[in-house]
Amino acid sequence: MVKVINSSGKHKTATARATVMKGTGKVRINKIPLELYTPELAMMKISEPLLIAGKDVVSGLDINVDVRGGGIVGQANAVRTAVARGIVEWTNDTTIRDNFAAYDRNLLVSDSRQKEAKNFGGPGARSKYQKSYR
């Protein structure tokens, strides 16, 4: 039976589900190869866990990620969390886990902060409309 690892990552309203399996080092986000993923900032952010884990680990894996919701940066952060969790679960290596945690804790832990809702009496969550006394 083929070993397949499913992992997930979240950031704001973006949710990413990664499938890690034995392969040739292909990484796809929504069926698009990582090399062709735009914008470049998001591609670089997603490739961080791959660079930290090392080429010897990643070259033997195929990673397919399905990401929904949120914006570009939120999706990129959700994908990198899902990929990092999948690599850690696949390798069962504490040194890789420690390297991820030392680099950025959000590689392993989802960032659950949400946008604060707008309230009445103002243009946003905290600010109020200007008050006039005369």
Swiss-Prot record:
Name of the protein described by the UniProt record: Small ribosomal subunit protein uS9
Any one Gene Ontology BP term: translation
PANTHER family for the chain: RIBOSOMAL PROTEIN S16, RIBOSOMAL PROTEIN S9
Region (Disordered) location: 114-134
GO MF annotations, alphabetized: RNA binding; structural constituent of ribosome
InterPro entries in alphabetical order: Ribosomal_Su5_D2-typ_SF, Ribosomal_uS9, Ribosomal_uS9_archaeal, Ribosomal_uS9_CS, Ribsml_uS5_D2-typ_fold_subgr
A GO term from the CC aspect: cytosolic small ribosomal subunit
Family: Belongs to the universal ribosomal protein uS9 family.
A Pfam entry, by short name: Ribosomal_S9
Keywords: Ribonucleoprotein, Ribosomal protein
Gene3D superfamilies assigned: 3.30.230.10
Transmembrane segments annotated in the record for this chain: none
Taxonomic source organism: Methanosarcina mazei (strain ATCC BAA-159 / DSM 3647 / Goe1 / Go1 / JCM 11833 / OCM 88)
Gene symbol of the encoding locus: rps9
Keyword check for Ribonucleoprotein: yes
